[in-house]
Swiss-Prot record:
Natural source organism: Gloeobacter violaceus (strain ATCC 29082 / PCC 7421)
Keyword Transmembrane helix applies: yes
Region Disordered: start-end pairs: 41-72
Protein keywords: Cell inner membrane, Cell membrane, Membrane, Protein transport, Translocation, Transmembrane, Transmembrane helix, Transport
Protein name (Swiss-Prot/TrEMBL): Sec-independent protein translocase protein TatA
Protein topology in the membrane: Single-pass membrane protein
Family stated for the protein in its record: Belongs to the TatA/E family.
Signal peptide: none
Main location: membrane
């Protein structure tokens, strides 16, 4: 289990949350939390693609020599 929490600890946390927020508010909060997590995951997965393309576009060009017209 994540963070070293077993089933008994998760059940105790669930019962405490149920007592604090009530049976009507708890499903609404769970739904909002799920939407927030989905939004965060989609934002994180979309983030690396623009950074990679931006780094390719901003790569420095090699210096070009200009014709001087003078013979040395």
């Amino acid at each position: 289990m994540p963070f070293g929490l077993g089933l008994p600890e998760i059940l105790v946390i669930g019962v405490i949350a149920l007592l604090i927020f009530g049976p009507k508010k708890l499903p609404e909060m769970g739904s909002a939390l799920g939407k927030a997590i989905r939004g965060f995951k989609s934002g994180v997965s979309d983030e690396p693609a623009p950074q990679q393309s931006a780094s390719k576009e901003t790569a420095p060009n090699p210096p070009q020599s200009l014709p001087s017209g003078k013979d040395s």
